[in-house]
């Protein structure tokens, strides 16, 4: 691969091009992905995050993969929004074991007005500890997005899950365009985007390629791209889906790395089902971020000490916390606020 090819970041990928990447011989694909990875990252550093469920279960969405959906009987005990102090205690614990980013997830269709003040206090408190902050709260409106940005939220997670064509087979309570709109609000507010998808839901190769195309062809690539392997939970409609071929999963990571060379590609849900050899291949394919700890929201994750033992055997070290230019972040927020105020001054006759 030429130096000029490595330096080019694209936003115009076609389905034919991406499928051709998937269909390369395995070794060729991994070589291309690893070459791209080394052009932008230290191949022996992996970003480490901890994920905490701050509100569990009884979600009104009908995502067929999710044990938190109120539509399915999975035996999951629902819990109300966690107290702010408890969240901060968990964040301190995460920092103590080596995490540099603390992600907070709530099983909501969207956050309510009464819950937003508590959510904002969580962001401010975790940020004050010196951790990067990330949240996944469902769909956001512009006002909520700006409030999160002003509180200091670094990343917002909102996955696209799959291709637009397959999406309706998995979720009916939220549209694909609504997901894209939330991502646009997040970007306009000056925050960073975490967005990816899930393998193993019965999707085709075209759907896997289509998901990556949606992400890679955004105006700016997501800074973080979580690639999840379906965790099959009894009671959900996808509990009996066939397992993903491990090599197909590695191919997905490799193609994500090639399409979005500057993004962190996260080895996310399903890592509990992966042996050490598969995880090592994932890092070779360009994965450079993991969730660290015992749970991913409601499903098991490899224990923290096992992760560090594997890192030691592979010569991998946790990535240091990314330092943000606060003045740049603040400038983006201020610009977004100005644009919102300006838009409120104009009456749209077409909407009447």
From Swiss-Prot:
InterPro entries: Aldolase_TIM, BATS_dom, Biotin_synth/BioAB, Biotin_synthase, Elp3/MiaA/NifB-like_rSAM, rSAM. It catalyses: (4R,5S)-dethiobiotin + (sulfur carrier)-SH + 2 reduced [2Fe-2S]-[ferredoxin] + 2 S-adenosyl-L-methionine = (sulfur carrier)-H + biotin + 2 5'-deoxyadenosine + 2 L-methionine + 2 oxidized [2Fe-2S]-[ferredoxin]. Pathway: Cofactor biosynthesis; biotin biosynthesis; biotin from 7,8-diaminononanoate: step 2/2. [2Fe-2S] cluster binds at residues 103, 134, 194, 266. One of its GO terms (biological process) is biotin biosynthetic process. Catalyzes the conversion of dethiobiotin (DTB) to biotin by the insertion of a sulfur atom into dethiobiotin via a radical-based mechanism. [4Fe-4S] cluster binds at residues 59, 63, 66. One of its GO terms (molecular function) is 4 iron, 4 sulfur cluster binding. Its cofactor is [4Fe-4S] cluster; [2Fe-2S] cluster. It comes from the Bacteria. HAMAP family: BioB. Gene3D superfamilies: Aldolase class I. Binds 1 [4Fe-4S] cluster. The cluster is coordinated with 3 cysteines and an exchangeable S-adenosyl-L-methionine. Binds 1 [2Fe-2S] cluster. The cluster is coordinated with 3 cysteines and 1 arginine. NCBIfam families: bioB. This is Biotin synthase. The keyword 4Fe-4S applies. The lineage of its organism: Bacteria, Pseudomonadati, Pseudomonadota, Gammaproteobacteria, Pseudomonadales. Keywords: 2Fe-2S, 4Fe-4S, Biotin biosynthesis, Iron, Iron-sulfur, Metal-binding, S-adenosyl-L-methionine, Transferase. Homodimer. Belongs to the radical SAM superfamily. Biotin synthase family. It comes from Pseudomonas entomophila (strain L48). CDD domains: Radical_SAM. Its EC number is 2.8.1.6. Residues 44-262 form the Radical SAM core domain.
